[in-house]
Amino acid sequence: MKLPLVLTISLALASLGACSPTLDWRETAAEGSGVVALFPCRPDRHARTLELVGSKLKMEMLVCPAGGATYALSFVDVPEPARVNPVLAELRMAALGNVQAEMPSSSPARIAGMTPNAEALRVAAAGHLPDGAAVQVRAVFFAKGLRVYQGSVIGTKAAAETDEIFLSGFRFPA
């Protein structure tokens, strides 16, 4: 699996925003995502082909740095229902593995309108970047139909209130 580039992009963008004094909250509806997200900054859009559960799939990401953290929403369309659970699990494992996460905590994801799924989880963990710097990661993994989503915040310190606003700010328009 080649997710380190996702982490590299996120961390590079975070370093650009380290001097940003304020958060500028905005609703963002990424074209083709089917979801509206509440970002504390104006996200850039990126796309990458990844190998997930044995298939090459296009993952699209909205990413922005703010307040010493990187905020990201990623989404990928899965070709068949039987692959939704494995893709959710693989994305979660990769996100935690990319920062060598230690002792993650998890709870069921609760996004109004999502497809109920046992692999839809919120996670929080402490980890380390390749250079040894300590980071906190908080993320939510969920699906609607055949589209799988990952919302994540990665930063050098946890900002519980800001992280919560972002991670609970996803919604599916009517």
Locations of regions flagged by a protein language model:
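Proline-anchored loop/turn motifs at beta-strand termini and strand-loop-strand connectors
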Residues: 32-49, 167
